[in-house]
């Protein structure tokens, strides 16, 4: 099988805070979309992370944000990236969810379901408890989807 050219790979940008880590948040290859693990970092906190990384300084502590707000930040960012790639949430094929505390699964599932048009539109999903999440936040979510 011939190798694709770099022209086939497109980095997708959206109004989602970048942390300054060595990765892209979203990459489109043909009609496939790959979304990196998204922690619940708002623009303010992501800016503090970028600044600390640029200076080689200690990273700031994660702010005390209620879990419901963290879940909505992550899902809003996921939706923004999917739409920036030219797709929609119903076109996600696989989602991986890491929860810091599995006791929050019902609350997360309630929020998660609200981002899809129907039960039939839900993607395949793996959910697990993480030993440690980025900056000790409540969750992280990554996804694979397609552009119809």
PLM ranges: what are they?
Residues 1-76, 80-94, 99-148:
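N-terminal presequence-like segments and the immediate start of the first folded domain
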């Amino acid at each position: 099988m011939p190798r694709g050219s770099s022209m086939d790979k497109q980095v997708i940008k959206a109004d989602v805070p970048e942390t300054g880590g060595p990765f892209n948040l979203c990459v489109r290859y043909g009609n496939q979309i790959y979304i990196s693990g998204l922690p619940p970092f708002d623009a303010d906190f992501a800016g503090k992370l970028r600044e600390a990384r640029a200076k080689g300084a200690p990273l700031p502590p994660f702010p005390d944000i209620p879990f419901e707000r963290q879940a909505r930040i992550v899902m809003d960012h996921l939706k923004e990236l999917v739409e920036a790639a030219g797709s929609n949430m119903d076109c996600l094929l696989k989602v991986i969810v890491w929860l810091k505390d599995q006791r929050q699964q019902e609350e997360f599932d309630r929020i998660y379901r609200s981002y899809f048009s129907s039960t039939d539109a839900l993607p395949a999903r793996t959910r697990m408890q993480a030993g440690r999440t980025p900056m000790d936040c409540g969750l992280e979510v990554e996804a694979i989807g397609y552009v119809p």
